[in-house]
Amino acid sequence: PREVVRLVLALKVNSLARGYSGVRWTVIETLLACLERDVLPAIPGQGSVGASGDLAPLAHLAAALIGVGDAVAGGRRLPATEALNAAGIALLELRAKEGLALLNGTQVSTALALRGLVGAEDVLAASLVAGALTIEAALGSITPFDARIHAVRGHASQSDVAAAVLRLIEGSEINESHRDCGRVQDPYSLRCIPQVLGACLRTLRDAAAILVDEANAVSDNPLVFPAGDGAGDVISGGNFHAEPVALVADALAVAIAEIGNISERRCALLVDPTFSQLPAFLATDPGLESGYMIAQVTAAALASENKGLAHPASVDSIPTSAGQEDHVSMATHGARRLDDMLRNAANIVAVELLSAARGIAFRRPLRTSAALEAVLAEIAPDGGGTGDRYLSPEIERVAALVRAGRFTPLVAQLFPTTAR
């Protein structure tokens, strides 16, 4: 994707500009010109094992700069020479070390992981909003979100999630209407939102710290350490090994799977009248209509698919280069699959958002909080509709809002990259 390639170029500039890669300024200036004029090398997403850097994908970047292969400019894929010439960018004539400096590095896997991190923040934010709506629709208790419970466990992210849910529900007539009910303990998918999504939030925060380190890293090899007067050392090491990115990508994958898992369980809870005290499957005429039955089945299918996709990529090392590269990270594959997982998770959360909106419609004329009413007005202005209907376009529309970060501002203070 265009935004990933732009990030790859920016990360490569940042690494080379540190001054340890033995390249001329003209190499960096050419990369910057490509960014400024939006001439982007055509880089494949596959072909890297995440050690010796992202060699194959970055080879396509380097090739374009010398006029080999293709580039994308103005939305069109062109021969690289044609694209560069049209933009007034001179072809690079590489000198010693410069080709290797362009090929070596973790920029592709890091760019993909950063994209996955931002996407995970958006899905987690939407999941918190969906969870708050489900609490309202199912007449769930907010007692388990009491700050004292979370303070004694000592996990800041857990406390932060609990506080965020309380803020979302604050001022709700629905919540006030059952304050003195006899319900003692809700199912874990409601009661343990702070514990589950708080742990996911901690994973995202930790991932951000590691990826920021990697974004500012010199992951070339060998490295050049000048000592002045033209002297210095050229040292071969292993900074190209993307294990930090691989482990982060795997952690993000597990977190994304868990966000989808708990959201799907709340979808199941909403269509079950035994707990929700709502019509079966949220149907206007239960028994005659299916309501949200198949929407929940879809959410279950996507949650299970994500469980398979969450298998750690980093444990699947495979030797390459006649055994010289005998341990590799698989970081690029691990980071690339995050997009598929995020798409699935966004669809699951969209099903929950729509299901909860339908449930709240049955609680009218009581209103939820001002913040959640604004969400309802956007996702389901008709209250989730009546009768059986074609739900796919609605799910896709709300999932697109999730992926676009529409709900993230409601809980933006939680996330490490909210300055984006």
Label every PLM stretch briefly:
Residues 37-38, 64-420:
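C-terminal auxiliary extensions adjacent to catalytic cores
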Residues 20, 49-51, 287:
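Conserved, non-catalytic sequence blocks in retroelement Pol enzymes and Pol-derived host proteins
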